[in-house]
């Protein structure tokens, strides 16, 4: 069984490499803040931006080039020259996913913009300059902060000693600027705040912690002291939110729908999947209770033998282009 699985994976990887050379891919450029950005994998870091997890939802005809960066607003992204770098790379038919707001609301002069004026102006610039290069802009508003204040508390904090039952918005008018500019300029808009608000509310106060960086002390090398972070997503949260984005894209940007793929688990050495090894995915699949499980193995070197109980699964071992 071990040998058969390994040979199947190797054969599919070789076939997929041949197929990938035959067609120029579409690129999705991503610009935004830490909730979208790629994260370091050092010391077992489990934080992920939703953009980091997006490649596992597309065929190899789509390349995700994530330029989102921690701590950036629409203003600082422009002033640091990051937008110029992205703009120079856009070709006709590419996409630019734009999500700012978390840091635009901060008071620091190098970050702050105003909804209805400077924030909207920066979004318009991204749209106009993307279109001038033949690209397709898509606007998003910010993902929700997991903010459950105790009853009667109006001050927004990073965390509370005791949480209340109602999820309360923290972004205000910064959520409306992308919607407004999208309507004004006929740009696809994804209300990612509503999607994530509904997700967190539906999961409830305690279960929704599983999406975010709630880390017990002593569990991970990258954060031995532990942390409570209601803004940033973990591996599970990043995958779930990326899935919500893909669902919305199929309606708002139907041209991308034919490139969408869905698997129960994704294995990826670059951190864009649920697991780093095939064996971890197989173990999760065997214990998951489903008879048919699909596993995507993204490109990388997997020097491992894969073992699984006979007849436990009907299907495993899809490659990145299979």
Predicted segment positions?
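Bacterial N-terminal signal peptides that target proteins for export
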Residues: 1-7
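Bacterial N-terminal signal peptides
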Residues: 7-16
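Serine-esterase "nucleophile elbow" of acetyl-processing enzymes
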Residues: 19-68, 84-96
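Alpha-helical cap/lid subdomain in secreted, periplasmic
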Residues: 23, 82-235, 239, 243-257
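Short, solvent-exposed loop/turn elements at domain surfaces
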Residues: 36-41, 74-76, 274-276
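Acidic Gly/Asp/Thr-rich repetitive segments characteristic of extracellular carbohydrate-active
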Residues: 265-296, 302
């Amino acid at each position: 069984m071990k040998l058969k699985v390994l040979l199947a994976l190797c054969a599919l990887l070789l076939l997929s490499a041949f197929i990938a050379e035959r067609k120029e891919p579409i690129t999705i450029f991503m610009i935004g803040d830490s909730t979208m950005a790629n994260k370091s994998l050092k010391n077992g870091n489990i934080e992920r931006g939703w953009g980091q997890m997006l490649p596992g939802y597309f065929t190899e005809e789509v390349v995700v080039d994530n330029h989102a960066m921690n701590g950036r607003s629409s203003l600082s992204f422009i002033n640091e020259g990051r937008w110029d770098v992205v703009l120079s790379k856009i070709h006709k038919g590419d996409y630019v996913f734009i999500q700012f707001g978390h840091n635009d609301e901060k008071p620091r002069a190098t970050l702050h913009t105003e909804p209805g004026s400077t924030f909207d102006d920066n979004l318009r610039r991204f749209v106009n300059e993307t279109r001038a290069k033949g690209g397709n802009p898509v606007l998003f508003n910010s993902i929700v902060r997991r903010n459950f204040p105790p009853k009667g508390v109006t001050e927004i904090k990073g965390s509370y000693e005791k949480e209340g039952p109602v999820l309360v918005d923290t972004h205000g008018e910064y959520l409306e600027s992308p919607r407004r500019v999208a309507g004004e300029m006929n740009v696809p808009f994804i209300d990612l705040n509503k999607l994530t608000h509904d997700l967190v509310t539906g999961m409830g106060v305690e279960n929704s912690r599983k999406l975010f960086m709630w880390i017990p002390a002593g569990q991970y090398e990258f954060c031995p002291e532990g942390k409570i972070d209601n803004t940033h997503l973990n591996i599970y949260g990043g995958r779930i939110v990326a899935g919500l984005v893909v669902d919305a894209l199929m309606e708002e940007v139907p041209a991308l729908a034919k490139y969408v793929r869905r698997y129960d688990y994704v294995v990826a050495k670059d951190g864009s999947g649920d697991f780093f090894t095939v064996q971890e995915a197989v173990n999760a699949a065997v214990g998951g209770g489903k008879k048919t499980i699909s596993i995507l193995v993204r490109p990388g070197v997997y020097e491992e033998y894969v073992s699984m109980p006979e007849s436990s699964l009907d299907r495993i071992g899809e490659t990145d282009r299979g």
